[in-house]
Amino acid sequence: MRYLCRAQLLSLLLLPLLKARLSVPAHPIPKIFLPLMISTWNYTDANREAWTVLRQGPRRTRQAVIQGCLHCQNSNSCGRLLGGHSAPDSSGGITLEAALIDGANMDYGAVAGMAGIRNAIGVAHDVLRYTNHSLLVGEAAARFAEAMGHKKEVHSLSTTLDVLLPWLLGKCQPNFWRNVRPLANDSCGTFSPLPQEQHQREMRQEYPIEPGHHDQVGFLALDTEGHLHAASLSSGARFRIPGRVGDAAVPGAGIYADNQVGGALATGDGDVLMRFLPALLAVEALRAGQSPASAAEAVMRRLLRHHTEFNGGLVVVSRGGVYSAACAGLDEFQFVVSGESSGRSMRRVEGIKCLDRHEVVTGGPRGNFYVVPKKIWAAGGEDVLVQRVEKITLNEGVDSREFEEEYVEDKAAEIDVDEGEKAEEVRSLLDESPGDLLLHQLGLAPPFPFRFPFIYF
């Protein structure tokens, strides 16, 4: 009887844990075993090349991710931007960037803004092996590459001009300038800064990510002994301002790996990725005990709270080979996974649907949302600072926005308006701005009192 009670007690203690382990994660645990090779986007040939190296045996993770990058930079199988010299900066310059990280000791090597050297990942590897630095940039990076034995090449001018000339004829749209004169949305420059008082906070312009037109690719390899390496390669954003460094070269932005917990690959708007270091955040979320699925989603939601129009994706892998992904702004985010199951090599293209960015930002469904004006008096005489009216129409994947002024706060507030002086003051303030549009759309009208929400973005 005593042993029966112990068994019953043990079952009661373990049952919740067993249920938790058996619950279905947001992204199903893959039926693929180690070793594991993951690469961003639907570039199966490059993934296959990397996998061929990885499955030769343990401790081949570094060579595997390098081989994947080499395949992309030496062929057109990873889209014409990476292999075809068709991602020039605004002056027509062709530069590359690449990075490599070792999850065992956190060694890191990267190059950025490097012109005339095709083998960017090889130079990044040399930075890791032969220097105490982490990142070399520009002409000095090219000189370092030549000293390491890499040959300088002349890029195809005709290919570059085929891309650059239509852009120049189209008044250099799109570009990456703001708060300058002449207006960046109608000119090629030369630009000069606007005075500070004339600066406007505009919604960040995001450029659509089209299939086969990616300017960055990432690879992550995990072997049977738990060794991790990650690598990235990028041609840089098209028509970028010369001198710009992208996320592919910045630790934690495009790639990160730590043998103790796992690794991550991020891709998309590099200037946003560099501000949040999502690959690093995801790995640290794993360290804190989150699953790859929850880590990926949490990081993506964090990006969206600050940059609602972000386009891109994130893949997170645990040290045990469980992986998941999250994305925003795309119809679908694809990545390629190769591994072994029952002694046989398996490869598949994973595709996930992206987060509904509007639910992240507004916490609500599709429809019409309004944000109302200025500083108005709440009941009790408190000042509440809000944004001027912004209408956001959220239909089936179509966004239309009307902006009047800059963001103010990143939280919601409600205001009770009572009859009397405060109500009249609120009413007059609303009349002075587009706030009457809000009242009309919400079906609210005088006489007061009324109650309505303020939705922040």
From Swiss-Prot:
One GO MF term: N4-(beta-N-acetylglucosaminyl)-L-asparaginase activity
Gene3D superfamilies listed in its UniProt record: (Glycosyl)asparaginase
Annotated signal peptide: 1-20
Spans through the membrane: none
Keyword Disulfide bond: yes
InterPro entries (alphabetical): Ntn_hydrolases_N (IPR029055), Peptidase_T2 (IPR000246)
Domain of life of the native organism: Eukaryota
Disulfide bonding pattern of the chain: 72-78, 172-188, 327-354
Keywords: Disulfide bond, Signal
GO CC terms in record: lysosome
Pfam short name (any one): Asparaginase_2
Family: Belongs to the Ntn-hydrolase family.
Protein name according to UniProt: L-asparaginase-like protein GA18140
Organism in which the protein naturally occurs: Drosophila pseudoobscura pseudoobscura (Fruit fly)
Organism taxonomic ancestry: Eukaryota, Metazoa, Ecdysozoa, Arthropoda, Hexapoda
